[in-house]
């Protein structure tokens, strides 16, 4: 059994929200680039001087060797490569988005941040899969978190409500919070909400309940966890003749508590990069488009298991389809 709760924000007859930040936020590409550089330097400083990691002990020779060796395919930890790297890429992407650059203009910042890290900030050879996951996964997670953080911004609020909104928005998109502090928007009061997107229809569902995971031949000896899942639908792909990047997306995630399974067991995201309504008749309609996908499934062996391979580990951090 599973307990579920959902919240629906009203649907619209027609789209009346804007798809580009250029009209709302001044473009500050040099500040965005500085933040990407500073982010990499901060992570490297932590790894080098606090954690004393060997891979962070870089010098001119290691950088030259990285360019000489060229990119290779690495076999680092599954969650590091396919969750941590895409999340890091989302911070690069959001450094640009929160400084007034639109979706397409922000893509080079995700790719550039990854290239800087892989070629300059580690003694290990540049990783092909890390660059792909950080760049493409970062683009998708970055745009999703940017738009979700926008839902909580309200410059009309004050007091405890304002603090709560800024904290929640900042947890979703840390780079946006940093830039709101830099520009003073975090405490500036105005007569408007100060959001980039307005009146976006949103569906949100949360589920909580036990989860049992076992291999078929050993179904009596699996693991039980407290599973928390959520699903969020943003926008409506059937409510407009044409839509641009991420006016519609769906995000699902699952978390396992009190078990040997990974905390993050599942992440699924699909967003429309471009789409168009191709047929409509009464209440029925058909839309076609190009969609970006992010899928991640992780599991672990039981602590007393005699097996050597986890039941499943599946991911696609860089995928596009129609």
For each feature predicted by the language model, list its residue ranges.
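Beta-strand segments within the central parallel beta-sheet cores of soluble alpha/beta enzyme folds
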Residues: 106-110, 157-162
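Alpha-helical transmembrane segments that form the membrane-embedded catalytic/substrate-binding core
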Residues: 88-89, 121-150, 168-172, 176
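Alpha-helical membrane-inserting segments
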Residues: 42-46, 96, 116-120, 141-149
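Outer-membrane beta-barrel translocator/channel fold
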Residues: 125, 129, 147-159, 292-310
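N-terminal targeting leaders of membrane proteins
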Residues: 1-84, 88-93, 97-103, 166-309, ...
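A cross-taxonomic marker for long C-terminal extensions/tails that follow the last structured domain
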Residues: 316-322
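Small-polar-interrupted transmembrane alpha-helices in polytopic inner-membrane proteins
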Residues: 103-123, 135-139
